[in-house]
């Protein structure tokens, strides 16, 4: 029989005290600061070794755009990230945001033929995709550099004049159903489903996110297409979007491509509700969840509910704790567990994060003996954390981490165009655009 996957949720008190200590070291932090700003840039801080040029512009409709000029790029790319996702599903329309993502690319007023955009991208050496998360929906593509403007001409109308052709509703509804069924026996999805069942019912994360034939069915006087249009018209507002465009052209040329095409997106000054409730009620904590996997897996994850960490991007307390807890050298938590014969691997960090909170998790790959001794192992983890808390956060260690981060920013490797723009478009919602290259 496969071993159990354990997920333990604890009060955040111990870890919060550690975070408070890390935050107190703000004055000791090493910040890349103006000295790392490329001389060729006016409003975006980049590594001095980054030869690309950047420009941030805000269009008349409040759409923030990051332009990237890279004459050496093999592919041009663009990404538009909407700060809206499954959290914005209507209560009785689970999966609607995901369904909208599917329906969006089925023709526009300017290019009415479904699949025309996809065909154009494929015929010119490119790729395209999209993804719906809890709070983001990200659309992106890359293409042979000389075809960027023509690709943008097809991409932009999806966000101001899509057709949402009714004759494709059944086809895309079945495509969503197929995605849902494909992951039913995936252990990661099964763990996620069990976690959602424990989330406070008032929190949007407690709801089913993918969608299927049942949740997307046409109801009496409520066809799903009509509700899809309502969701689009309410939330696909320029003030909730970030656009990143990378091309071989100059910044002025890129701006000339973008402004007329994306200024047409409507701005409703939409505000998104921020859910202040905790993911899991304090009354339920500490909470132990056991999941029997379909594959041979032995893992334990200990999670702590914390405030949103993104506002502390300059100080990076969660990253400091992740490095401290996830260290693998002599005297580390992992080494201690290995000496007991209980663990094979360990990682730590703030993973799930939304507009109001985050989860900091310690994930441990167990040996067969570690699985048997999982209760004792958990006690040992908490004892180790308490020892670190009692000893306090050492300024020299924090400064060392900050120096390493500054060095990594200075000598960062160049990413592929499509992944780069997709990541930046999402990060622009979290950090000041001037700092987005170094904040994440």
Residue ranges and their predicted role:
Residues 12-24:
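Bacterial N-terminal signal peptides
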Residues 106-110, 142-175, 356-413, 432:
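M16/insulysin-pitrilysin zinc metalloprotease superfamily fold
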């Amino acid at each position: 029989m496969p071993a159990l996957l354990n997920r333990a949720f604890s009060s955040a008190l111990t870890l919060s005290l550690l975070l408070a200590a890390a935050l107190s070291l703000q004055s000791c932090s090493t910040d890349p600061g103006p000295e790392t700003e490329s001389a060729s840039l006016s409003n975006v801080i980049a590594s001095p070794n980054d030869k690309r040029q950047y420009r941030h512009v805000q269009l008349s409709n409040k759409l923030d755009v990051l332009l990237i000029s890279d004459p050496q790029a093999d592919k041009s790319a663009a990404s538009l990230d909407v700060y809206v996702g499954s959290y914005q599903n209507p209560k009785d329309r689970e999966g609607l945001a995901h369904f909208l993502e599917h329906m969006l690319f089925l023709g526009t007023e300017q290019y009415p033929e479904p699949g025309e955009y996809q065909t154009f991208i494929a015929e010119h050496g490119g790729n395209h995709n999209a993804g719906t998360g809890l709070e983001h929906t990200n659309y992106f593509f890359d293409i042979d550099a000389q075809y960027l403007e023509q690709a943008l001409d097809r991409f932009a109308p999806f966000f101001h004049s899509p057709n949402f052709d009714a004759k494709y509703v059944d086809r895309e509804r079945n495509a969503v159903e197929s995605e849902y069924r494909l992951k039913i026996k995936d252990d990661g999805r099964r763990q996620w489903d069990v976690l959602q069942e424990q989330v406070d019912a008032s929190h949007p994360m407690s709801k089913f996110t993918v969608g299927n034939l049942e949740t997307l069915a046409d109801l009496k006087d409520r066809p799903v297409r009509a509700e899809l249009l309502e969701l689009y018209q309410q939330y696909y507002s320029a003030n909730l979007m970030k656009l990143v465009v990378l091309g071989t052209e100059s910044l002025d040329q890129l701006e000339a491509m973008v402004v007329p095409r994306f200024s047409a997106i409507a701005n409703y000054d939409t505000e998104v509700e921020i859910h202040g409730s905790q993911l899991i009620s304090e009354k339920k904590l500490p909470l132990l969840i056991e999941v029997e996997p379909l594959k041979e897996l032995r893992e334990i994850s200990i999670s702590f509910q914390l405030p949103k960490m993104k506002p502390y991007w300059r100080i990076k307390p969660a990253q400091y704790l992740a490095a401290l807890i996830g260290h693998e050298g002599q005297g580390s938590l992992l080494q201690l567990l290995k000496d007991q014969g209980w663990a094979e691997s360990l990682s730590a960090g703030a993973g799930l994060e939304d507009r109001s909170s985050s989860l900091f998790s310690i994930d441990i790959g167990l040996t067969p003996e570690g699985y048997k001794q999982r209760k004792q192992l958990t006690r040992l983890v908490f004892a180790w954390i308490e020892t670190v808390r009692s000893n306090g956060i050492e300024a020299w260690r924090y400064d060392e981490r900050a120096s390493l981060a500054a060095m990594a920013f200075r000598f960062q490797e160049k990413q592929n165009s499509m992944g780069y723009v997709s990541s930046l478009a999402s990060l622009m919602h979290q950090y000041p655009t001037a700092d987005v290259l170094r904040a994440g």
